Amino acid sequence: MPVIRWWLSLEAAAFGGAALVHAGVLVHGYEHAKAATAESVIGLVLLFALFASVVAPRSSRAMALASLSLALLGTLVGIFTIVIGIGPRSAFDIALHVGFVASLLAGLGLVARGRVWEQRQRA
């Protein structure tokens, strides 16, 4: 359970930071309102899953899988917008999306194998 919460916290912080960059709060030069909105929504979904894992611990795994999957889908939509030319196309944005995909896939793998991993830790 703590691993799931830790991972959701990490992902929510990453999307929140990206939203702040795209809003021009942390760094100037990468402003993009639609990207900031999308990253904010994804970050809030991840925070909701984190909150749900505290309130209803038995649903942690399901909430994490659902929220990480939604975040991955949103990130893939972001990559699609970059490819077709309507999303931000800086090197920062490309690296950001590649990093998001890698971390989300790692998180999904970690959560999906969570019970096996937890059983090995207890043995």
Label every model-predicted segment:
Residues 1-123:
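Topology signature of small-to-medium multi-pass alpha-helical membrane proteins
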